[in-house]
Amino acid sequence: MAMNETFGVRLRKIRKQKKMPQWKLAKKIGISQQQLCLYEADKHVPSLTIFEWICGALGVSATELLGY
């Protein structure tokens, strides 16, 4: 992860690499598309539970999503 890459940027990048639209990821994890948009815009931070669901839905590890 680039030093200036935020969680939201990383989330959006991985989601797009997986060719998953926002609405589909949001539906898979049980949140609104608007809420997912707020995560990708770095306006909100997901809870640990939602973070784990995002990792599972995208098929990535927590360290990969965090960029470590």
Task: Indicate residue ranges for each PLM-predicted region.
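Residue-level signal for the short linker/turn that defines the boundary of a DNA-recognition helix
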Residues: 9, 19-20, 46-49
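DNA major-groove recognition helix of helix-turn-helix/homeodomain DNA-binding modules
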Residues: 49-64
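Short, conserved catalytic or interaction motifs in soluble domains
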Residues: 41
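Short alpha-helical DNA-recognition segment
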Residues: 19-38
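Phosphate-coordinating loops and pocket residues in cytosolic domains that bind phosphorylated ligands
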Residues: 38, 67-68
